[in-house]
């Protein structure tokens, strides 16, 4: 049997973050938690999700299972989520039973789980290759507030289609060029809430629209870790905090984006 309970707002925001990158996902569930990997249709970006069992309000998985889910369909279900809603997921071990049971309860309006909204969803067979993410040691890393990252990527996207990201000792520089305009922004270690480490100067160019899509995860995490090295995809990682404490959790949502070589 598989069952879990998770904060409704978090669960809804997670699928809202993914909706323009993936159409279908396989949530791989085992005793340690839920994992998911997926590529966008252009095969230039990769999503890596890991939610460990301790992050959930309740988690149980007696037998490994895969939940094939349509993102848009799940968002329709989660549209009733309110600020203090809780989501329950339940699935029997029977392999022939391709149904996910979902319960949604609003803690402010309902007194018990017996009053929850009950939904049954037929799982899909999301055809996904299992992807191996190579372990890379990045030369440069920058930690900053995720909201600041989101605000500036949106601004860059309004100016140009591509953004150059450069890192050197104590600084990260983002720049883009539009019609008769060039915008450059430098983030340095002496700025509030910025931490940069760099062992080798690196500069690469990326499609701005992907950074905007990734930045939607700012609703899930206060900080973002940007990692850069030559000739490999940039890593943009959002770590989740445990819901009842301020401690960082191994749970995360990480995006990888290939540098611009041609058009994509």
Curated annotation (Swiss-Prot):
MF-aspect GO terms: DNA binding; DNA polymerase processivity factor activity
InterPro entries to which the protein is assigned, alphabetical: DNA_clamp_sf (IPR046938), Pr_cel_nuc_antig (IPR000730), Pr_cel_nuc_antig_C (IPR022649), Pr_cel_nuc_antig_CS (IPR022659), Pr_cel_nuc_antig_N (IPR022648)
Keyword terms of this UniProt record: Chromosome, Cytoplasm, DNA-binding, Nucleus
GO biological process: leading strand elongation; mismatch repair; positive regulation of DNA repair; protein complex oligomerization; regulation of DNA replication; translesion synthesis
Complex formation: Homotrimer. Oligomer. Interacts with ORC1 (via PIP-box motif). Interacts with FEN1.
Locations listed in the record: Nucleus; Chromosome; Cytoplasm
UniProt organism field: Plasmodium falciparum (isolate 3D7)
Protein name: Proliferating cell nuclear antigen 2
GO annotation, cellular component aspect: chromosome; cytoplasm; nucleus; PCNA complex
Family matches, as Pfam families: PCNA_C, PCNA_N
Induction: Induced by DNA damage (at protein level).
Primary role: May be involved in DNA damage response. Appears not to be involved in DNA replication in trophozoites.
Principal subcellular localization: nucleus
Family to which this protein belongs: Belongs to the PCNA family.
Domain of life per record: Eukaryota
Record bears the keyword Hydrolase: no
Signal sequence, start to end: none
């Amino acid at each position: 049997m598989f069952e879990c309970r998770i904060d409704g707002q978090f669960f809804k925001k997670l699928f809202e973050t993914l909706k323009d990158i993936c159409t279908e996902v396989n949530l791989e569930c085992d005793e340690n938690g839920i994992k998911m990997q997926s590529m966008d249709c252009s095969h230039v970006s990769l999503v890596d999700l890991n939610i460990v069992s301790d992050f959930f309000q309740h988690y149980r998985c007696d037998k490994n299972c895969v939940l094939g889910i349509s993102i848009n369909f799940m968002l329709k279900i989660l549209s009733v989520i309110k600020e203090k809603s809780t989501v329950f997921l339940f699935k029997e071990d029977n392999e022939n039973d391709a149904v996910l049971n979902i319960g949604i309860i609003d803690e402010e309006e309902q007194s018990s789980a017996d009053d929850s909204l009950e939904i049954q969803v037929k799982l899909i067979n999301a055809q996904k290759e299992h992807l191996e993410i190579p372990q890379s040691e990045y030369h440069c890393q920058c930690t900053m507030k995720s909201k600041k990252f989101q605000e500036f990527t949106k601004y860059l996207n309004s100016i140009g289609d591509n953004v150059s990201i450069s890192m050197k000792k104590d600084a990260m520089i983002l720049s883009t060029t539009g019609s008769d305009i060039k915008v450059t922004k430098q983030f340095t270690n002496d700025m509030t809430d910025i931490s940069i480490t760099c062992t080798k100067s690196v500069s690469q160019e990326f499609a701005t629209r992907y950074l905007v899509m990734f930045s939607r995860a700012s609703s899930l995490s206060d900080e973002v870790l940007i990692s850069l090295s030559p000739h490999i995809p940039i890593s943009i990682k959002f770590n989740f905090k445990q819901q009842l404490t301020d401690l960082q959790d191994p749970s995360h949502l990480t995006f990888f984006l290939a540098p611009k070589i041609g058009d994509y």
